[in-house]
Amino acid sequence: MATKVKSQAKLRFVSVEQVQSAIKEIGDLSREHTRLATEMNDKIGATSEHYAPKLKALKEEIEPLQKAVQEYCEANRDELTEFGKTKTANFVTGEVQWRQRPPSVAIRGAEAVMEFLQRMGFDRFIRTRQEINKEALLNEPEVAKGIAGVTIKQGLEDFVIKPFEQDAR
């Protein structure tokens, strides 16, 4: 039979002094957390700054190679795809693929397009979204309580601990 791992005893305070000490410790730990997060972000920034030129140089080296491979493959597409029987051409070191993107719609000037569609009677191209008005439900809580699936939450309280900190000036 497996042995049960004992859980850590629950921390309890019985005096104001203990609570004050705990709030001070929360502040100290929070500041240390912030300091470490800042240090981590500084190192991430320095690392990114260090590698950015190298990555850019590699990308600039890759781009002409990609263009040349694409030009060759486009020029020899029939031979590589067995006259369109396949969409992939295999080479010893890798493969190239031709993939048709699905159709998409790009809209510039959405308001003008919307007005035109409405004016021309193209309502089938307009989507009307319905959603529940939560503000109206909150304004009429007595009516809302009688609706199945609707719950009005009231009197919820958050407990916030704010250790005092001196602002550096």
Curated annotation (Swiss-Prot):
GO terms classed as biological process: DNA protection
Membrane-spanning ranges: none
Any GO MF annotation of the entry: double-stranded DNA binding
Keywords: DNA-binding
SUPFAM superfamilies in alphabetical order: Gam-like (SSF161266)
Matching InterPro entries: Host-nuc_inhib_Gam (IPR009951)
Purpose: Protects linear double-stranded DNA of Mu genome from exonuclease degradation.
Protein family membership: To phage Mu protein gam.
Protein name: Mu-like prophage FluMu host-nuclease inhibitor protein gam
